[in-house]
Amino acid sequence: MDRIDVHHHFIPPAYVEAFKTTGGDPSGWHLPQWTPESSLSLMDSHNTRTAILSLTAPGTSILAHSPGASATLAREINLYAAKLHNENPTRFGFFASLPHLTPDTIPAAIEEAIYALETLHADGITLYTRYTGTGYLGHDAFAPLWEELNRRKAVVFIHPTNTAADARNRSILVNPALPQPIIDYPHETCRTAVDLITSGTISRNPDVKIILSHGGGTLPILATRAAHLLYDAKLTSISPEDFLEQARSFYFDLALSGNDENMQLLVGRNGFAKGGHVFYGSDFPYAPVSTINKYVRMMEGFSVQGEEVEKAIARDSAVKLFPRFQMPADLRVGKTNNWGAFSACLLLPVGLSALYSVLQSRVHTYST
């Protein structure tokens, strides 16, 4: 069964250079080695035909101290991602990066989002769970960005980032064996999801499709608790029923979350996620290949809901959200590598258009 990986990171050269000038990842995690070939190798090993690339945290916020530099980095990263897609149209898509978000940089972020979606044909936009100095994604300052994304019916991929930080925005580790991506990131995803609901951002922008990383973090576990406590304590006017409906409107990837317990919670009997709202994700290259392999085996061993749910998670649900990666049915048979044939299908309209232009030119020449 072929897959579409919606949680697959890349590390552009410009991002590596930014890390060198700022002292490394503030989350406490390491910067792995990455090349496009390493992504393709992992994809082939798991029959993944398409990976939608994204920049992990902190993203362009690594240059939060310099808004201009952050905006320049976002553009360089998006151009690099678009180049990878153009060179490998069936294998790579991408979620575009934006400059570090503050109230002052929202206009630049909107400009970059429009450029990425309209000109570079990005598959969506990457946002992080919070931004230093502003807060979580339901903050009033972000409202114009959400309005623009809603107007465009955009897909937004939300990735967690570090929470507690020192004056240099570097993570405060209570235990060096607990880098924030391991434990804290799932909590951050829940926090920003609840913030989006209680701030009214979700209800005001119903046409944005939001993907939460890592199975939604702790949201599926805590949503009912939050829904009732917030309402009963009169901290929100949103009814528990409405709160839970909004919480279930998110999409969820299974990066590092495809174990049996999470699968039962999301897609088992009375699962938290709506049908068609759960996707495969690997978290390559930040997750070790050995860990990715384990989670793939766990997902393949989960069969409570049958083959249709398995196919939906692996590929079909993602195709509905990203139709440009639909593969003709006759090219999906078996496990043969048909990328070249599919590329030919994609490029055929381009060739026909060029042929039409040539013929038109000749007709014009003969007529004169």
From Swiss-Prot:
Main localization (coarse): membrane
Binding site for Zn(2+): 7, 9, 159, 283
Cell membrane keyword on record: no
Molecular function terms from GO: 6-methylsalicylate decarboxylase activity; hydrolase activity; metal ion binding
Enzyme class: lyase
EC code: 4.1.1.52
GO annotation, biological process: secondary metabolic process; terpenoid biosynthetic process
Membrane topology, from the record: Single-pass membrane protein
Matches recorded under Pfam families: Amidohydro_2
Biotechnology usage: Yanuthone D is an antibiotic against C.albicans, methicillin-resistant S.aureus (MRSA), and vancomycin-resistant Enterococcus.
Reaction(s) catalysed (UniProt annotation): 6-methylsalicylate + H(+) = 3-methylphenol + CO2
Recorded phenotype for the gene knockout or disruption: Loses the ability to produce yanuthone D.
Protein name: Decarboxylase yanB
Organism listed in the record: Aspergillus niger (strain ATCC 1015 / CBS 113.46 / FGSC A1144 / LSHB Ac4 / NCTC 3858a / NRRL 328 / USDA 3528.7)
Species lineage: Eukaryota, Fungi, Dikarya, Ascomycota, Pezizomycotina
Gene (UniProt): yanB
